[in-house]
Amino acid sequence: MPNVVIIGAQWGDEGKGKIVDLLTRDTDYVVRFQGGNNAGHTVIVDGKTYILHLIPSGILHKEKICIIGNGVVLDPQIFIQELDTLLSQGIDVSPNRLKLSTKTHLIMPYHKLLDQVRENASTTQKIGTTGRGIGPCYEDKVSRIGIRTIDLTQPKLLYKKIELALKEKNTLFTQLYNTEFVNAETIFNEVMETASRILPYLSDTSSILQDAFIKNKKVIFEGAQGVHLDIDHGTYPFVTSSNTIAANASIGSGIALSSTEKIIGIVKAYTTRVGSGPFPTELYDNTGKFLQEKGHEYGATTGRPRRCGWQDLVMLKDSVRLNGFTELALTKLDVLSGLKKINICTSYAYQGESVTYPPQDEHILFNEIKPIYETMPGWEHSLESCTSWNQLPQCAKNYIERIEQVVGVPITIISVGADRNQTLFRDI
């Protein structure tokens, strides 16, 4: 298997964790390259559920090496909690198997506080942040006042960096948001309490990956969130704080762009979104509730109910353009079972015309476009016992083939249930 980048093709929650888990069987390394614990990847193995926020899904496979790259922002306490949870489940998370970049930035307590007070103070436009401190951490990274994992090795320097960061933060907290002054020593002590658990994992992960490529090892790059949450190319400002598209696999892990050969987009059979932002095909009726309940559409990170809607091929084609997907994996096809009719959005109505691309202005996407649907017949019986393409109902096959026709990319993996073995592989 060639080196593969796995990207969520919608607004996140597409089922990337399951697909990464499946493909890990044929790989040697699994790499997280962006985002933080605002992402939740759910993997079900033999009826047992694992929810991973920071550690790559490949950790569930023995002898696979997992890497958290420089593009990730890491909450020390959440990282340790995740380690302990996996240990309690009998999973090997030793430093021999899990590597953490020395360049990874740390989410500090003041980042989480700033995230929360900002969202609470907003009266006009709430982004729907998870409040995990992801955005403020990336802000400090760009402002060159961030704290990196390597700083844990030099406590005196770390303390000075915390003091520097808090000069501005405390002005914001006390004068703009009317919250309490944050003490540098308190923050320092809290962070240093985690150092002994984190330091053994620190590695030059870029060099490790380069060595892996030289030895012809196989690598999966595991994306978080989804294309349309990308800070540059998503539905701004209702986006995350990092680049979620495939090109960032190179930057966020410290490897050459030419190191990746296959890019797989993960797309749900319908569309979901968490938090605020444009959602052209959103359903407010009983069908939307049907998808939400049958699909268990509640966030793995926040528990918030996900907004649900029909498949949007306009947005999916945009994802194909931005990432250069070589193939797609379609998840949760089984959720559509029982619907007599299934709508699929192939274009938007805008100013009396039919357009097949998303408007760049989020106001237009929010208020001025209407989805144009094709209606396809649904299917009644469950798909969960299907083990091959030939066993799928003809209407389900037609649905899959119509998606392929419109976006121009083959669907090679089809998920028909939550468990690892409820997956069909299709040679095209």
Curated annotation (Swiss-Prot):
Gene3D superfamilies: Adenylosuccinate Synthetase, subunit A, domain 1, Adenylosuccinate Synthetase, subunit A, domain 2, Adenylosuccinate Synthetase, subunit A, domain 3
Keywords for this protein: Cytoplasm, GTP-binding, Ligase, Magnesium, Metal-binding, Nucleotide-binding, Purine biosynthesis
Chain sites annotated for binding substrate: A300, T301, T302, G303, R304, P305, R306
SUPFAM superfamilies in the cross-refs: P-loop containing nucleoside triphosphate hydrolases
GO molecular function ontology, one term from the record: magnesium ion binding
PROSITE patterns: ADENYLOSUCCIN_SYN_1 (PS01266), ADENYLOSUCCIN_SYN_2 (PS00513)
Cofactor(s), by name: Mg(2+)
Keyword Aminoacyl-tRNA synthetase: no
Residues the record lists as binding Mg(2+): D13, G40
Subcellular location: Cytoplasm
Purpose of the protein: Plays an important role in the de novo pathway of purine nucleotide biosynthesis. Catalyzes the first committed step in the biosynthesis of AMP from IMP.
Subunit structure: Homodimer.
UniProt xrefs under NCBIfam families: PRK01117.1, purA
Protein name in the entry: Adenylosuccinate synthetase
Organism from which the protein derives: Lawsonia intracellularis (strain PHE/MN1-00)
Gene name of the record: purA
